[in-house]
């Protein structure tokens, strides 16, 4: 049984790229056609590459590798957090702080500060501090939790990263390249496939597209760590009832068109 069907990809709008004038020519191999000035991603290739990514991720998870999900754009932030937590991974979904990986020792010091402040809060010790001091410390705690909360259990550098919106997360990509950390990334039509190790051509703006693909990657991690599809199914009910996302258009109308091979070119 395939990891994902063409119908699922179509219904989630995975095939919609950017306007043709905003493309990266290096993505031409993954582009099927153009419609009304918008590039359409070749979903046959996307489906195959998701299969390959799934097998790769499952194998790495089975070997005990640790994953970091990165995506700070509004559409992806909640999904990044949800799927990272579901698969027992780390995440950054608010802002990428320069040196988060390449200057890990310094960042780890800030993470320890976060844990220290959390302990003060949870133990009730902050309530015993002067009101002004407690207010300052709580503001510091809130800021650290916002930016570092997703990596507070990360004891060392991740073995692999999963990225949504390569262009927005370019600084993170550069840090991973410097450190030799493999990159799994959704690639919209304005991205550069040469910058990643495991490409997944896909719409990285639509919530349903991001949710579908990150969900599959998360499934692969769970299956790899816990040994089989049953482990994934154990989590599906909670996952389906989690965060609600705004509804997007119904893309199933494109299914017949895609299957027929008709295009504007």
Swiss-Prot record:
Q: Please name the InterPro entries in this protein's record.
A: Ribosomal_uS2, Ribosomal_uS2_bac/mit/plastid, Ribosomal_uS2_CS, Ribosomal_uS2_flav_dom_sf
Which UniProt keywords are given for this protein, alphabetically ordered? Ribonucleoprotein, Ribosomal protein
Gene Ontology terms describing biological process: translation
What's a GO cellular component annotated to this UniProt protein?
cytosolic small ribosomal subunit
| Any one GO MF annotation of this record | structural constituent of ribosome
Task: Identify the domain of life.
Answer: Bacteria
Which Gene3D superfamilies does UniProt cross-reference here? Glucose-6-phosphate isomerase like protein, domain 1, Helix hairpin bin
Q: Which family does it belong to?
A: Belongs to the universal ribosomal protein uS2 family.
Could you identify this protein by its name? Answer: Small ribosomal subunit protein uS2
């Amino acid at each position: 049984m395939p990891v994902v069907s063409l119908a699922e990809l179509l219904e989630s709008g995975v095939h919609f790229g950017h306007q043709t004038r905003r493309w990266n020519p290096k993505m031409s191999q993954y582009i099927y056609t153009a419609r009304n000035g918008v590039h359409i991603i070749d979903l046959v290739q996307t489906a195959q590459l998701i299969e390959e990514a799934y097998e790769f991720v499952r194998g790495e998870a089975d070997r005990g590798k640790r994953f970091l999900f990165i995506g700070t754009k509004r559409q992806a932030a909640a999904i990044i957090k949800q799927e990272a937590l579901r698969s027992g991974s780390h995440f950054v979904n608010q802002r990428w702080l320069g040196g988060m990986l390449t200057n890990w020792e310094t960042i780890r010091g800030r993470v320890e500060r976060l844990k220290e402040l959390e302990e003060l809060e949870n133990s009730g010790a902050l309530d015993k501090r002067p009101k002004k001091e407690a207010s300052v410390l709580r503001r510091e705690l809130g800021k650290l939790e916002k930016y570092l909360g997703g990596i507070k259990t990360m004891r060392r550098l991740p073995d692999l990263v999963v990225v949504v919106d390569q262009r927005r997360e370019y600084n993170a990509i550069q840090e991973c390249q410097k450190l030799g950390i493999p990159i799994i990334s959704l690639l919209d039509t304005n991205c550069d496939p040469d910058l990643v190790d495991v490409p997944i051509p896909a719409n990285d703006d639509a919530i349903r597209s991001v949710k579908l693909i990150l969900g599959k990657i998360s499934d692969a991690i769970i299956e790899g760590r816990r040994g089989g599809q049953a482990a994934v199914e154990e989590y599906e009910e909670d996952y389906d009832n989690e965060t609600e996302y705004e509804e997007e258009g119904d893309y199933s109308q494109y299914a017949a068109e895609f299957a027929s091979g008709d295009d504007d070119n």
